[in-house]
Amino acid sequence: MYNKLQYISQGKTIEEQLLNIRKALENGCQWIQMRFKDTHSDNVFTLAEAVKRMCQEYTATFIINDNVYLAKKINADGVHLGLNDMNIAEARTILGEAKIIGGTANTFEEVLQRTAENCNYIGLGPFQFTATKEKLSPVLGLEGYHLIIQQMKTKKNKIPIYAIGGIQLENVDDIMKTGIYGIAVSGLITQSENPFQLITQLNKKL
């Protein structure tokens, strides 16, 4: 099954991205989602090639946010697709059955939709306010996660659900009690002054 901790990369330049990704990898994170927006496609390709090599060095899973064709071109482990990105069926045709395709959801109905579309895991959020995303869906909180997980149980839906959006270390125990499978974090790791201690604690809690 998939690692329960996913780091979504941050950084406005290739150098910043690589620094942050290496920080996550060398301190124990085994799953990287590369997210590099608002830049030239050549920069995204250059970064993706470098991150792939880095993830191979640490035997970590490497997926790319949004860019199915790039994931195919460099043979990444998969992609993560938002609700307004390429549809999952089309991505599956391009990437094949063996690749990981994650999908975003904000409601139980969207979880069912993503499951029917045959994605491998769902990023469900946001948990709370986050500055990482400009257009934020309605915040779910612990109550929202608990409700959606209970609804999934009644439907016998076992797709892995990752909590995402503004998660802090002190939230993790309560989030996991809702029945969530794992967490995806960005700023929490990027901004950490002691990433080894943080990631070790996160991996223990998960």
From Swiss-Prot:
The lineage of its organism: Bacteria, Pseudomonadati, Bacteroidota, Flavobacteriia, Flavobacteriales. PANTHER family: THIAMINE-PHOSPHATE PYROPHOSPHORYLASE, THIAMINE-PHOSPHATE SYNTHASE. Its cofactor is Mg(2+). Belongs to the thiamine-phosphate synthase family. The gene is thiE. GO terms for cellular component: cytoplasm. It comes from Flavobacterium psychrophilum (strain ATCC 49511 / DSM 21280 / CIP 103535 / JIP02/86). It is an enzyme of class 2 (transferase). This is Thiamine-phosphate synthase. GO terms for molecular function: magnesium ion binding; thiamine-phosphate diphosphorylase activity. One of its GO terms (biological process) is thiamine diphosphate biosynthetic process. CDD domains: TMP_TenI (cd00564).
